Regions:
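Alpha-helical hydrophobic helix detector
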Residues: 19-35
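Hydrophobic positions in long alpha-helices of the protein kinase catalytic C-lobe
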Residues: 48-52
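Conserved loop-to-helix junction within protein kinase catalytic domains, corresponding to the end
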Residues: 72-76
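Short, surface-exposed interaction loops/tails
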Residues: 2-5, 38, 42-46, 57-60, ...
Length: 143
């Protein structure tokens, strides 16, 4: 073909080629997407377990300094602010100025004395309701 014959034709992908690419991308998303979603759900639960471990270390430091764990009414706030002007309090015991929330944006629950040990520290999980099974199960320091 001469240059004059090609001048009217535009280069690019045909409609069939675009449809084939979209079908392939859709198949890949259908296969890979659910697996990635399951991993993301599991990673939030793992974050809760790691944050609880961090809280446990900080609670131990509080206990060494004050001679006891924070009461239920003092809660985890006692880790970042002196609850009731305790003379032996040497905090803050957490690296942040606020108590972190769980990955679902809800406050961690704390009880002292606990039902499972000296204290109970737990998240109600993604549903935010006590109990639950599977991905909605509560995650606590006693598990």
């Amino acid at each position: 073909m001469s240059d004059s014959e090609n001048a009217g034709r535009e280069t690019g992908f045909s409609l069939i080629e675009l449809i084939v690419v979209l079908v392939i991308l859709g198949l890949l998303a259908g296969i890979v997407g659910p697996r990635i979603y399951d991993k993301l759900k599991g990673s939030k639960q793992q974050i809760v377990r790691l944050q609880i471990k961090e809280f446990e270390g900080s609670l131990q430091l509080f206990s060494f300094d004050v001679g006891r764990f924070p009461s239920t009414s003092e809660g985890l706030e006692g880790m970042v602010r002196n609850p009731g002007n305790l003379e032996s309090w040497r905090g803050p015991y957490l690296s942040k100025s606020e108590v972190p929330k769980d990955p679902w944006g809800k406050a961690y629950n704390y009880r002292c004395p606990g039902q499972h040990g000296d204290y109970d520290l737990f998240s109600y999980g993604p549903d935010g309701v006590e109990g639950g099974e599977g991905e909605n199960a509560d995650i606590g320091n006693w598990q």
